[in-house]
Curated annotation (Swiss-Prot):
The keyword Protease does not apply. The keyword rRNA-binding applies. One of the primary rRNA binding proteins, it binds directly to 16S rRNA where it nucleates assembly of the head domain of the 30S subunit. Is located at the subunit interface close to the decoding center, probably blocks exit of the E-site tRNA. It comes from Borrelia duttonii (strain Ly). One of its GO terms (molecular function) is tRNA binding. HAMAP family: Ribosomal_uS7_B. Belongs to the universal ribosomal protein uS7 family. GO terms for cellular component: small ribosomal subunit. It holds the Pfam family Ribosomal_S7. NCBIfam families: rpsG_bact. Part of the 30S ribosomal subunit. Contacts proteins S9 and S11. GO terms for biological process: translation. This is Small ribosomal subunit protein uS7.
Amino acid sequence: MSRKSKKIKKKVFKDSKYDSQVIAKFVNRMMYDGKKFISESIVYNSIDMLAEKLEEVDKVAAFNKALDNVKPLVEVRSRRVGGATYQVPVEVREERREALAMKWIISAARKASGKSMQEKLANELVNSYNSTGAAFKKREDTHRMAEANRAFTHYRW
């Protein structure tokens, strides 16, 4: 039995504008050097742009759909058996799904060239909403990798 104590999950408060915990987590992930005000303004403006481009009434629903389209269902993890290392497909927990989706959307937006961060993030959210773009491609690559290594599922732990 493990001697380590169970990690206590820190509660993330809902954001002030949309009263959504998911958007609050997204803002925190966007943040650099504790500059939350800047991060909030970037995220809020890009959500406004997202709703404007999609002509969507409910901004939070549009944001959540964009995030859901990028969430991975399975991923591969390395498992050493004997002398060989296998890529074993494993189902992803809900919290990790959300975290990976946010991470992929933000990194795809940061890698895009030109324009302001608000516009880049809004474009990536629109692409995610429409199941296209770099973040969605990352999800598809992850699923493809898991599918290719399906033979090793019996090595799960």
